[in-house]
Amino acid sequence: MNKALKISLIVFIACLATAGLGSWYAASFINPTQLTKLLSSTVKDATGRELQITGPVSLNLFPSISVKAEQVSLSNTSWASNPNMLTFKQIELDIRLFPLLKGSVEISRIGMTGLEANLQTNQSGEGNWNLTPPVLTGKSSATQTPVNGASNDSTDSTFVSIKTIDIVDAIIRYQDGNQAAKVIHLPKLSLGGAEGKSTILLDVQYEKFSLNLKGTTGSLRNAYFAWNQSPVKMDLDLDLTLNGKTLAIKGDIDKKPQVLPTFNIRLNSKSFDLAPLAGSAAVAGKAGGASPATPHKPQGNYFFSDEKLPFDLLPLADGVIGVNIAELGIPGQAPFTNFKTTLQFKKNNIDANDLSFNVGKGSAQAQISIAGFDGSAPKVSIKGLAKDFSLEQIVASADSSAKASGGATHIAWNLQGSGVSPHQLVGRANGVIQISVGRGKLDSKFINKGGDFVVTVFDAINPMRKQSNQTILECAVAYLPVNNGMINIQDSVGAQTDRLDITLSGSINLANEALNISINPREKSGLTTGLDLGGLVKIQGTLQNPKAGVNKEGVVNSAVSIGLGFLTGGISIAAENAKSLATKSQPCKTALHSWSDIYSASK
C-alpha cells in the first residue's frame, strides 16, 4: 500500500477515535434526568406550555447524541376541552453536542411515534396551537427587554437548528368550536433539509380520502425564518396524489422583504379528482385561521349552501398558476377533459380569462373573476358557453343506471354576485343564464336525479309521469334573467314533449329561495275540455322544499271559461283553445334569446 495512503488512513482513524472518545467523555457528564428538566424548561420558555415525560428516558451516544423518551405530553391551553394538546408514545431528539456543553439545547432532528394531536378553536376563532409564550408582568419595560431578548435568542437556537422531522402513526383530531371533532390519520410525515433544499414525504388519510405529497422544495426552514426579513427564492418540484391520482406541481416562489410574493407555478396531471381536495380544503379552511374571526353560522335550510367559501385560503400575491389536466373529476358530475386555464393573481384579485374544457363530445369556455377576496363581500363574476354535448353523453359517463338518448345541449351564462357563501352570491346576483336542450328521450331515473324541484315540476306538468318510465322531449329552453337575486319568468321557460307544449311563468327569489311559479301545459291537438288542469297548479315553497299548490287565478279563469261555454254552446271554449294554439304553439322558440347577447368571448 502507498505510504502516503497508509498515513492518511491512520490519521483518519485516530481522529475518528478521538472524536468518539470525546463524545463519550462529554456524554458521561450528561444526566438523563437533568437533561429532561433542561428540555422541559426550554419548551416552557419557547411555548408557555408544560412538557411532561412519565415514561423511561434513554440516552444514545452514536452516531450522535440522542435522547429517547416515552409517554410524553405537551399541555393544552386553558380553554381547551382536552388537558393535553400533544401526546407521544415515543419521541426521539438528536441534540447538538457543543451547545449542550454550554447548557443550551439545539435540536437537529425530531422523531415521533404514536403522536396524538388535539387541535381546537374557541368561539372567537382562536386556535390552541398558538404557542406564543405568555408575557411576564411586574417588571419594568427596561428590565424586561434584555431578559426577553436573551430568552428569544435561546428559544430560536433551539428550533432553528432542526433539520429533520420524522412522524409515524399520528392521529390529528380537529374540533371547530363545539362541533364534532374531525379525525385525520397521518401514517407518515418526513421533512428533511440539506444543501438549501427540503425533502417532503407525507401520507394523510381523512374519511374515505387518501393524500400523498412527495418531492423537494427550497429550504422550508430558511424560508420560514427569512420571510419578510431577507429575500427568499424557492423552487417547487412536488407530486400530490389524491386517491391514487397524481398532480405534478412545479415552479418557483420569490419573496422580497415588505413586498407581496410572486410565483410562477404549473399544475399538470393525466387524471385528477377534485372531491378529495374539496374535503381537505374544508378542514384546512377551518384550521388555517390563526387570527380571531367572527364565526360564520350556516343556516342549513338553503338549496345554495350558506357555508362560508374558503376565500381565506387564497394568497395575497402576484403570480401565475397554469393548469393542464387531461381528465378532471368533478363531484357529482361527468369529468371534464382537456381542462386548461391560467390563473392570474394580482394582490386580492384572481382572473381566469382562458378557461376551457370538454364534456363528452362537447366543449366549454369560460371567464372567471374574483375581486377583493380578502374583504367581507368578495365579488365574483362568471361567464361562459358550453355547446355540442348531449344529455346522453353526460348521463353515460356520470351514471350508467340513468339512461337518456339525444338531448343536444347548449348553455350560456353571464353572472355577477358578491358574498362569502354560495347563498349570498346568488342572493345578490345579476345577469342571465340560458339552457337549451334538443330532442331526446329521458327515463324516470334521470328526471329523479334533478332533485325535488325538478321532480315537482315534472309531476305537476304530467301527473301520469310515474306510470311511464320514459319522457319524449322535443325541446326545452330556459332563459333566466337575474336582477339582484330575483328571477322573473314570463314565457321565458318553455318545453315541448310528444304530447304537450309547456310554459312557465312567475318568479324565483334567490335571496330567500321562495318559489312562485305557474305551470301552463297545453295539449298539442288543442282539443281540450276547456279545463286546463295544468293551469290549476302552482309551484310554491322553496328550492329546498318545493310544494305544488293551487293556482287560484287559474281556477277562476277556467271556471269562467266553462260557464261561458255552457251559455254559448262551446264557442268560448273553442276560441280559448284557438288562442292557446296561436300564442303557445312554439314555447321553445318564444323563450330562446340570442346566444351572443349572453356570452361573447370578446366581451
Describe the residue ranges of each PLM region.
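Extended terminal
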Residues: 2-12, 24, 228-241, 245-247, ...
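Elongated, acidic membrane-bridging lipid-handling scaffolds
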Residues: 19, 136-233, 300-345, 473, ...
